[in-house]
Every structure is written in structure tokens, then in C-alpha cells.
Amino acid sequence: MVLGNTRVSLMIEDNCLFCMIVKGQLPSYKIWEDENYLAILDIFPNIKGQTVVMPKKHLDSDAFALSDKELTDFMIATKKVANLLVTRLDVARVHVVFEGMHTDHLHSKLYPAIGLSRETKQAIAPEKIYFEEYPSYVTTLEGPRAKDEDLKRLQVTIVGFRKRNKNKENSD
């Protein structure tokens, strides 16, 4: 279903975990709220203070399918919560992820960088990982050094695709 430029899932409210939380039908640990958005502590955190920010209105989990205004409003709400975490948890930064694979309701996940020095330092994990296909989760671990010829081929694929789409848009 499309509402404006935004896809709205037909899994409306009755079966949506986040809609039930917004309605107060499921318990949550609310840390911030305004008229349109809600932020709760994640009950499955991998770091203290991990937070989920969600719109109160049920929207498809693909953040980049939103209209520019909807995405901007959502990012502003996410930023407000990130700033709250920075201040209250006394952290240098908060990292944000839009994945939306587990729950089909638009949301961002915030990860307070507890223990990160306020001075910028290069931190590289010793382990490397690479996936041929998306494994249904996100990691920021680096992979092995990609081959230049593979990167060049991928660059041509992406740039060529973009140019073809621009030409198609201009012909419509």
C-alpha cells in the first residue's frame, strides 16, 4: 500500500510488535517521546543503552523509501535521542543503524559508544569478515582487502546503472 511517497505495510498494528509497544499493549522502557516518535531501550542490547527509535505511525521498515520530509523528520528524532544518550550516558558518540530486517516497522537502532575516548583514535578489530550474501544482520567489522579489479568492475556496474537510470528519468 502506498500513502503519499511512503509504503505502509498491511501488517497494520495487530501483529506489529512496535505498534503494540506504541499503543501500550506491550511493556517497554521508554526514554524519549514526542507527538510522532518513541524511543525505548532495546531489550536485547549488545551494549548498555542500546536504543530503538520508531515512528508512532506504522511505516514500512525501508528508511530510504520514505519521502525526503519523512526521512528528515525521522532523522531529527533519531538525532534528539542520540544527543540524549551522549549527555546522559556521558559518551563521545552514538552510532546509528537502519536495518529493519527483524521488525517490519520503520526504526533506527542507536549504539552508545561506551568506553570510546573523546579523542579520535583508529580502532580496527583484528578479525575480518566478508559475506557473499546478506546474512540478515549488520556488522562494522572490516573485510579482507578487496582486489582492485573487483572494485573497478563494481564501480562500473554502479556508475553505469546510475547513468542508465538518469537517462531513463530524463526520457520520461
Predicted regions and their residues:
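HIT superfamily nucleotide-processing domains
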Residues: 2-172
